[in-house]
């Protein structure tokens, strides 16, 4: 069955992976008292709260002295980031403010350029810390020219945002296409996620059925899609949202409901309770990715928020565990045939494959077929295949599994 795509004609426009904003972590999962280590795009960064500027900072996770990780350091009594190895201290601009070993009557070596730490532009939007992956000073004010994709519903004060994040032993491309694939749900997640409306003519135990799925307005910035139960929007490279109502495609990667009844901070929202599911897919390194995901929902009381969040936490982790090993192996098979040959190697004849095909078409047409690691890695060099029992670690044993409600912190 032929799948149609409404593509914007931009034949000479290529997607620049390193000229984009990338999500780091939800604010509610960050402790202001300590620095935090993260790897994004193969870059080791440290995230910390600069109380002097009242802002989250993202630095290169390397002390210029002996290359020790600053994420293992501490925030000193003056609010500076201190390297725990030799005590060097840095302010929010990356300037070294104190070297304990330097004599006070000697040359001010702490002011030398080589004593500075690389600083990445960062901002907070939709209660998430974002960073721009370049320490070049020319990007210091990049947020004034280009902002991260904005989801207005996440700034609606009458609703609750619930966040989770988790690292996965498979890459960015497989992570994105799996989220876009509704056809696998009754099979890969059988017994965990039930269909709301079972098919009238049930052909198997799981209850799979044909569905109308389509992709529209595919260009270098991503695409929007339509499913029977609602709409989706992929804003390259990281943001994938599911909406109950038609998507209003706006500038700067924004998307919101088209049927609206109230206005908050210049943005429109429906009066009736509604839900937006959001997913931020983050390349970590070849064969590894991170997902920040959650939902926005109108709830009445704090106890409803806690219960809803806990149920969401438990159910979603069962879901992602159930196809974890399958995707770990699938990625290696894709690499064997080559990412550029995905369309030839995979037989995707039904409309239910439209979003996955749309994502792969976007990759092939605009983004070099797969994530570009900027020379840091060869994208085809994946880590060794792990045994199933190592990949599918029970939720109770996970160290990097977090969830939170906007304005609170839980693990």
What kind of feature is each model-predicted range?
Residues 9-15, 24-153, 411:
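Rieske [2Fe-2S] iron-sulfur-binding domain
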Residues 19-21:
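Polybasic, low-complexity association/targeting segments
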């Amino acid at each position: 069955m032929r799948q149609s795509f409404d593509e914007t004609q931009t034949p000479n426009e290529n997607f620049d992976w390193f000229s984009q904003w990338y999500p780091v972590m939800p604010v509610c999962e960050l402790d202001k008292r300590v620095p935090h280590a993260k790897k994004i795009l193969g870059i080791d960064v440290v995230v910390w709260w600069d109380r002097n500027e009242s802002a989250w900072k993202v630095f290169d996770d390397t002390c210029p002295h002996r290359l020790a990780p600053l994420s293992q350091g501490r925030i000193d009594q003056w609010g500076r980031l201190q390297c725990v190895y030799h005590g060097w201290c840095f302010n929010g601009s990356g300037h070294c403010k104190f070297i304990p070993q330097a004599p006070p009557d000697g040359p001010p070596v702490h002011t030398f350029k080589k004593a500075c730490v690389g600083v990445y532009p960062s901002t907070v939007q939709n209660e998430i810390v974002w960073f721009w992956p370049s320490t070049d000073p020319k990007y210091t004010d990049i947020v004034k020219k280009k902002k991260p994709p904005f989801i207005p519903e996440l700034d609606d004060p009458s609703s609750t945002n619930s966040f989770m994040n988790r690292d996965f032993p498979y890459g960015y491309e497989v992570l994105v296409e799996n989220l876009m694939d509704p056809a696998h749900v009754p099979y890969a997640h059988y017994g965990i996620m039930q269909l709301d409306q079972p098919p009238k003519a049930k052909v198997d135990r799981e209850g799979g059925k044909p569905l109308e799925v389509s992709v529209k307005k595919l260009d270098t910035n991503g695409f929007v899609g339509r499913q029977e139960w609602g709409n989706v929007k992929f804003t390259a490279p990281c943001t994938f949202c599911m909406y109950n109502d038609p998507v209003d495609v706006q500038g700067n990667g924004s998307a919101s409901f088209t049927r609206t009844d109230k206005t908050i901070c210049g943005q429109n929202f429906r009066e009736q309770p509604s839900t937006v599911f959001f997913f931020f897919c983050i390349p970590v390194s070849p064969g590894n990715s991170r997902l920040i995901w959650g939902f926005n929902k109108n709830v009445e009381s704090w106890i409803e928020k806690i219960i809803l969040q806990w149920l969401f936490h438990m159910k979603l982790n069962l879901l992602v565990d159930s196809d974890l090993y399958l995707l770990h192996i699938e990625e290696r098979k894709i690499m064997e045939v080559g990412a550029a040959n995905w369309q030839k190697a995979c037989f995707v004849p039904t409309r239910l494959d439209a979003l996955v095909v749309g994502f792969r078409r976007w990759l092939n047409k605009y983004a070099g077929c797969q994530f570009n690691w900027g020379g840091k890695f060869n994208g085809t060099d994946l880590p060794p295949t792990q045994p199933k029992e190592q990949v599918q670690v029970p939720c109770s044993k996970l160290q990097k599994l977090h969830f939170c409600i906007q304005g609170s912190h839980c693990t």
